[in-house]
Amino acid sequence: HFEYIVIDEFHHAVAKSYRNIISYFKPKFLLGLTATPERLDNKDVFELCDYNVVYELRLKDAINKGYLVPFYYYGIYDDTDYSVIPEVNGKYKEEELEKALMIHKRAEIVIKNYLKFSNKKTLAFCASRNHAEFMAEYFNKNGIKCCAVYSGEQGKNAMDRNEAIRGLKNGEIDVIFTVDIFNEGVDVPEIDMVMFLRPTESPIVFLQQLGRGLRKAKQKNYLTVL
C-alpha cells in the first residue's frame, strides 16, 4: 500500500469512487489540491483531511501576489431572455437553450466584440456541442481561424483536444469553442482571452473556466474576459 497519496482536483474526493480508494490504501499522509473546495451539494471536502488546511490562497490574493495575471471583464449585452427558457433539475433545458443562443444576431454581437481586441489565443465556452459547432462555423465563415472541441460525436468543425491546443499555441488557431472538456486538467498559459457564451449556473464551474486563462506566460500581462 502507498503511505503517501496526493490527489489533484480534490473537490471530487467526496465521491464514493474516491472514498473507496482512500479507504483501501489508508495512507499515512493524504494531500489534497484544489482551486474550488466548495461544492454545490454541500458535501464537506475538508472533512477528508480532518479540517487540516496546510495552505489556502484565494483568487484575489493569488493575483495580488503575482502568481496569476489580472483580468479585465467586459460585459456584453444581448436580448436573450433566460426567464422563458425551461429548467430541468436546476439547469436550462439544452434544446431550448440552443434555440435561444444559436442565432446569427447573437453570433454577430460576439464576433463584433471579439474583433475589438487584439487577443489571438481565445477559449470560448459554449452551452452544448451544437452551440460550439454553430459558433465555430460562424467564426470560420468570417475568416477567423477556429475549431470546436468537445466529447461525443464529432461535427464538421471538431478537432482533437491536443491537436487544437497545439494549433492555438503555434498560431494556426485563434479560437477554440468548447463546452466543459477544458474545465479541468488543461494547462495552456498562452490563453489570453476567455469568452463566456453560455449561462453558467455553478460558481465553481465559472471559476474553473475563468482559471483557464489566468496562468502567467511570456508577453502576457492580463486576461481579457468577454
Indicate where each model-derived feature is located:
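Conserved RecA-like ASCE P-loop NTPase motor core of nucleic-acid helicases/translocases
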Residues: K121-S128, V149
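Catalytic P-loop NTPase motifs of RecA-like helicase/translocase cores
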Residues: I7-V14, R39-L40, G185, P203, ...
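Conserved helicase ATPase core of P-loop NTP-dependent helicases/translocases
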Residues: A132-A136, N140, I144-F182
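Inter-Walker segment of RecA-like/P-loop motor cores
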Residues: H1
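Conserved segment of the helicase C-terminal RecA-like domain
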Residues: P203-Q208, R212-L226
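SF2 helicase motor core recognition
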Residues: G66, I176-V194, G211-R215
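Conserved interdomain linker/interface between the two RecA-like ATPase lobes of SF2 helicase motors
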Residues: V53-L123
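Post-DEXD/H (motif II) to motif III coupling segment of the RecA-like Helicase ATP-binding lobe
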Residues: Y4, H11-Y73
